């Protein structure tokens, strides 16, 4: 799959932007703060319904505007598809596919991308929440129906936490909470699907991760990934603010039927402590993935270069997995300001690793940072304006309209 045309209205620093895109590599180049990352951020939003830079949609709407619009013309095997999302400041977001209204969470069914940015170093060095988000985004891109499962789990978790907080405030005992049993069952039923799906995903990622790491780093440091499950922990961690999970190796759980009894036992075991804390202490929202290099945890032991190579390999492995599974061609691969962070050898190896993808979109502040064969088609960005780009294809006006 490739993006033939991207159109933005009131997105970030763009009042309006239109750019035609070609197969192969396209380089968006411009000084920092000019808006090049905003273009690829918009495409990332279409496939993940989130930004790699901010946690709230509001920041994506241009100051003074009430909504932002992202439109893309997609092409695969000679067929075209128009997708659109309207991000609203004071109402729910809206979406269209070929002018037909749809739920925003359905968009990943039609468009997949894998974006790598400097912020992704936190996948190796940061908190578990980022690693969970990586897995869940990839789950939805591979199996779109899981977007509903993840949403259902969040709702059940919120309801259960509300009940636990209320019970703590009123000093209620465990045997006085019949309603909690209902939410326990629902949390276990939904959460077990997520745990199993993540486990199967990590298992599928492993061989691709090993190949991608070797391609980027040029050495085999034995990269590995293993799920760590809070339902297996005796102590799930005291500091929920810091997101310390206390989870244990759960690599064997790839079927929800195997997870259910273990999750059920963990919920029962932790109920007294959860009533004390007013918080659900076990479940997929508290899990992690342990990354290792040379048998040691990458977090805390890997060098800066090794951490970069591991993070890059994770994204390349994700892209290869989507490419292998997809019936609509390769995911669009997005490299946001990546080459500036790499030495010359890694730049060359990364360029070689991404060359085979149908479409690769790259941003850079310095033209010379990007290997020449990836920079042949350059789009220059200056002060929120696109210059020196191919003439945009005919597209609907991005101003005034929105997703119906």
From Swiss-Prot:
Key words, A-Z: ATP-binding, Cytoplasm, DNA damage, DNA repair, DNA replication, DNA-binding, Nucleotide-binding, SOS response
PANTHER family, sorted: DNA REPLICATION AND REPAIR PROTEIN RECF
Organism: Clavibacter michiganensis subsp. michiganensis (strain NCPPB 382)
MF GO annotations: ATP binding; single-stranded DNA binding
Origin organism lineage: Bacteria, Bacillati, Actinomycetota, Actinomycetes, Micrococcales
This protein's record includes keyword Cell inner membrane: no
Known function: The RecF protein is involved in DNA metabolism; it is required for DNA replication and normal SOS inducibility. RecF binds preferentially to single-stranded, linear DNA. It also seems to bind ATP.
Gene (name only): recF
UniProt name for this protein: DNA replication and repair protein RecF
BP-aspect Gene Ontology terms: DNA replication; DNA synthesis involved in DNA repair; double-strand break repair; SOS response
GO cellular component, one term: cytoplasm
UniProt xrefs under InterPro entries: DNA-binding_RecF, DNA-binding_RecF_CS, P-loop_NTPase, RecF/RecN/SMC_N, RecF_2
SUPFAM superfamilies listed in its UniProt record: P-loop containing nucleoside triphosphate hydrolases
HAMAP family, A to Z: RecF (MF_00365)
Keyword DNA repair: yes
Top-level taxon in the UniProt lineage: Bacteria
Gene3D superfamilies attached to this UniProt entry: P-loop containing nucleotide triphosphate hydrolases, RecF/RecN/SMC, N-terminal domain
Binding site for ATP: 30-37
Family listed: Belongs to the RecF family.
Subcellular localization, as worded in the UniProt entry: Cytoplasm
NCBIfam families referenced in this protein's UniProt entry, alphabetically: recf
